[in-house]
Curated annotation (Swiss-Prot):
Protein name per Swiss-Prot or TrEMBL: Probable cytosol aminopeptidase
Family classification: Belongs to the peptidase M17 family.
Primary gene name: pepA
InterPro entries named among the record's database cross-references: Leucine_aapep/pepB, Macro_dom-like, Peptidase_M17_C, Peptidase_M17_leu_NH2_pept, Peptidase_M17_N
Annotated active site: 272, 346
Length: 494
């Protein structure tokens, strides 16, 4: 699909950057000659806009070998960022998709500034080509034909091999994010814990990773009472899924991803209202993020050891379901008083974290659609983070800045720990109250990370979008897939 060339050839469409300071770049000047001065007229009359994310289409009318030019406004260079570029190109690729373009080129060097080099631009272009044109996988009987971009050429004077490598990495990041989106969008009667485990096994086998899928009996032997409690009411068997990627000869410096895999959450006996229940098929967004990251890792083969652990079940009501006031024993040996069966994700993750440590994780990053409280605190565009290790958090933060997936750190104070430890009957309680809900959930998980460096990522607000946006349609976003993979790719760098 991807090609790199030094000279512009015949294409259906060519994408060109327009900055406010460079309305008459060398390329535009040359092209204007072919258009007999008409481009300059369009610029002067503002028919070609330099405004951020403005897309101006110009037909060549046979004056060049290119059928149509798409000029992408990027505003002033001083305010040009990777986020601006991602949004602008995402919108552009959506426009090309709507026009059913199959052969497009991007004038890569027109997007290069002192802030962003050609490799950065190539990576982002290939990434958002996939993200921006992603479509929901539906179950409608009337299937519409989709015209795909078959040929995408980067025009640049830079080294072709380096640009090809950047295009490949960007493409893999975009495709894996879309894989995660598809998982989150699947209905709960299709994506059960068993089906999620089957998907994970297929992924592991494709990329020659080791894997384990623990069944209920094995979980009982290991004392995974927290996950098993959540599963008590279900007819669907639980799964504890583990993928093991060995990027080094020695099993050291192991990064452990733990993704919440609740395939549907009714709230249990702490039942959600109807409005709060619809959409809870997406409560396995953390699991999807982890699997998406493992897809990237499998493709790119970084020299880093990684474990991905996914505790998976649904949380439903029945005569056997767990109840408020139950006391359960987690794999760690710590006992938990259940005050809220709708705070089930942290119970599943507690055993997932302990199991990741058992498998050898030296660093822990858990990802979960955990609390509505994080949405109240940070909205729908920022992931909440908590940590017991600032050095590890800084690496996660840097990765998120590279991928434009914003995160914000929330605190853990001793008084927060006292609240989750406040129980007359057990070591911990699973829900101290509504105040500081997002912080309480993260603090609870920290009790199981203990001294292992750990970062908690609450993606309840960022896992799905209520409306279409420049990087995709309404629905699942694939939040944190690219950040987790970038963390692994950059881990330990100075």
């Amino acid at each position: 699909m991807f090609q790199v060339q030094k000279e512009l050839a015949s294409h259906e469409a060519v994408v060109v950057a327009l900055f406010e300071e460079e309305k008459t770049s060398s390329f535009v000047q040359e092209l204007d000659k072919a258009f007999e001065g008409q481009l300059q007229v369009l610029l002067e009359e503002k028919e070609l806009s330099t405004k951020k994310k403005a897309i101006s289409k110009v037909h060549s009318l046979g004056k060049t070998d290119v059928k149509r030019y798409y000029f992408v406004g990027l505003g002033k260079k001083e305010s040009y960022t990777t986020e601006t570029l991602r949004s602008a190109l995402g919108k552009t690729f959506k426009t090309l998709q709507a026009a059913k373009v199959q052969d497009a080129a991007i004038l890569l060097d027109s997007f290069v500034t002192e802030k962003l080099d050609a490799i950065d631009v190539a990576h982002i272009a290939a990434e958002v080509q996939g993200l921006g044109t992603y479509e929901l996988q539906t179950y409608k009987s009337d299937k519409k034909d989709r015209v795909e971009l078959e040929k995408f050429t980067a025009i640049t004077a830079e080294d072709a091999q380096e640009i090809e490598a950047a295009l490949t990495v960007g493409y893999v990041h975009g495709r894996a994010t879309n894989s995660a989106r598809t998982l989150v969008n699947m209905p709960p009667n299709v994506l059960t814990a068993t089906k999620l485990a089957e998907y994970a096994v297929e992924l592991a086998e494709k990329y020659d990773m080791d894997y384990k899928v623990l069944e209920k009996e094995e979980m009982e032997e290991l004392g995974m009472g927290a996950l098993l409690a959540v599963n008590q009411g279900s007819v669907e068997p639980p799964k504890m899924i583990a993928l093991i990627y060995k990027g080094k000869e020695e099993w050291t410096d192991v990064i452990g991803f733990v993704g919440k895999g609740i395939t549907y959450d009714t709230g249990g006996y702490s039942l959600k209202p109807r409005e709060g229940m619809v959409g809870m098929k997406g409560d396995m967004g953390g699991a999807a993020a982890v699997l998406g990251a493992m897809e990237i890792i499998g493709e790119l083969r970084p020299e880093q050891n990684v474990i991905a652990v996914i505790p998976s079940t649904d949380n439903v009501v029945s005569g056997t379901a767990f109840k408020p006031d139950d006391v359960i024993t987690s794999m760690s040996g710590k006992t938990i008083e259940v005050l809220n069966t709708d705070a089930e994700g942290r119970l599943a993750l507690a055993d997932g974290i302990t199991y990741a440590k058992k498998l050898g994780a030296n660093y822990l990053i858990d990802v979960a659609t955990l609390t509505g409280g994080v949405i109240v605190a940070l909205g729908n565009h920022t992931t909440g983070a908590m940590t017991n290790n600032e050095e590890l958090f800084e690496q996660v933060l840097e990765a998120s800045m590279e991928t434009d997936e914003s995160i914000w750190q929330l605190p853990i104070f001793d008084r927060d720990k006292e609240r989750v430890r406040n129980s007359k009957f057990a070591d911990l309680n699973n829900s101290p109250g509504r105040e500081g809900h997002a912080v309480m959930a993260g603090t609870f998980l920290g009790e199981f990370a203990e001294d292992t460096p750990w970062v908690h990522l609450d993606i309840a607000g960022t896992s799905e979008s209520s409306g279409a946006h420049d990087l995709g349609p309404a629905g699942a976003t694939g939040a944190m897939v690219r950040t987790l993979a970038t963390l692994v790719e950059r881990f330990g760098e100075e």
